[in-house]
Curated annotation (Swiss-Prot):
Keywords: Coiled coil. Belongs to the chibby family. SPERT subfamily. The keyword Phosphoprotein does not apply. InterPro entries: Chibby_fam. Residues 180-231 are annotated as: Disordered. The gene is CBY2. The lineage of its organism: Eukaryota, Metazoa, Chordata, Craniata, Vertebrata. Residues 259-307 form a coiled coil. The keyword Coiled coil applies. Signal peptide: none annotated. Residues 206-215 have a biased composition (Basic and acidic residues). It holds the Pfam family Chibby. Residues 182-195 have a biased composition (Polar residues). This is Protein chibby homolog 2.
Length: 328
């Protein structure tokens, strides 16, 4: 393309408020406009900056990528927490398997009153999901909070459909004693007397019987409330003892593991010490052989010097004689 092809008359020479120090010449050919920049005619389409919609698309893309990155980071942190919890549960399961393999456990012995209270109540406890306990868990009780933290330990036994083992403490089994037989017998007697009275009463004495029932109901309610609280205290005490015993056995397991690891480390240290001694002996042998070789090399060097020295002397004398003869 030559300069004659351009229409120089249509060149735009007007320039209001230039943004640069110099104004680049422009020429229009057909529907395209060229600008002279750095010694070249360049199409203005290639010199225009990016449009605003493109910038918006790029910003939206970066925002989406940033949100995805934040979600990935949150999921990663949650995964780390779940791994830690899984590790803790695995260690507890391992400790319980070790205790189960040892013949150190006995079964908890429940009294008749506690079994009756367990059967009467229909509220499940988080500690024993297969049994019915007659008390509610209060968040303020520290002992229950501690037992709740170790509830996963007890869930293992319920999954296996086995009774919860305890440990011989001072060669005696921890047994839940019966303390409310008198209260339960009083309840049974009162129930039997009321049933017999209902069977013997006639239609004429119905009003008197109703009055007697109203007078006896509060006493029966009081007798029902008292043994339930005592049973709850007994169950809480048994759970506290169980938790303490489990802690003791976990400590013993940790101590046994530490001892085993200590013995293993001692054996490894002994093995490495023996290997070190062997390597040291080999190093001394190598040093001795190297010193012998160096002494032999020195002796050979001296012998070579003794042999070659007279030969070099004769050759030097011959060269001196030839040089003298050549000068003459």
């Amino acid at each position: 393309m030559t300069m004659s092809a351009f229409d120089l008359t249509k060149q735009s020479t007007r320039c209001t408020k230039p943004e640069m120090d110099c104004v680049f010449p422009r020429m229009k050919v057909r529907d395209e406009t060229f600008t002279f920049i750095d010694g070249k005619w360049v199409n203005e389409v290639h010199c225009q900056p990016t449009f605003v919609p493109q910038r918006r698309l790029l910003s939206k893309k970066t925002e989406n990528e940033w949100s995805i990155w934040e979600e990935n980071r949150a999921l990663w942190e949650e995964n780390q927490v779940l791994r830690i919890e899984n590790r803790m549960l695995w260690e507890e399961n391992k400790a319980l398997q070790y205790l189960q393999s040892q013949n150190k456990g006995v079964q908890l012995v429940y009294s008749d009153t506690i079994q009756q209270s367990l059967q009467k109540d229909h509220k499940l406890s988080p500690f024993f999901p297969e049994r019915h306990l007659g008390f509610q868990v209060s968040p303020g009780n520290k002992a229950l909070q501690l037992v709740r933290e170790r509830s996963s330990v007890l869930e293992f036994f319920h999954r296996q459909n086995r009774t919860v083992p305890t440990i011989w403490k001072d060669q005696q089994a921890i047994v839940v004693h019966e303390e409310n037989k008198g209260a339960s017998s009083v309840q049974k007697d009162t129930e039997n007397t009321t049933a017999a009275g209902e069977g013997s009463l006639g239609p004429t004495c119905q009003e008197e019987h109703d009055a007697k029932e109203e007078s006896t109901t509060p006493t029966q309610n009081d007798t029902k409330i008292a043994p339930s609280t005592e049973d709850d205290n007994e169950i809480l005490q048994a759970l506290q003892d169980l938790y303490q015993i489990l802690r003791v056995f976990l400590k013993e397991k940790c101590l046994s593991d530490d001892r085993e690891s200590l013995h293993a480390l001692q054996d490894e240290s002994k093995f490495f010490q023996e290997e070190y001694k062997k390597l040291k002996l080999q190093l001394n042998n190598v040093k001795n052989t190297v010193s012998d070789i160096t002494t032999q090399m020195e002796m050979l060097e001296k012998e070579l010097i003794a042999i070659t020295f007279p030969i070099y002397e004769e050759a030097g004398k011959n060269m001196a004689n030839e040089y003298q003869l050549g000068e003459m």
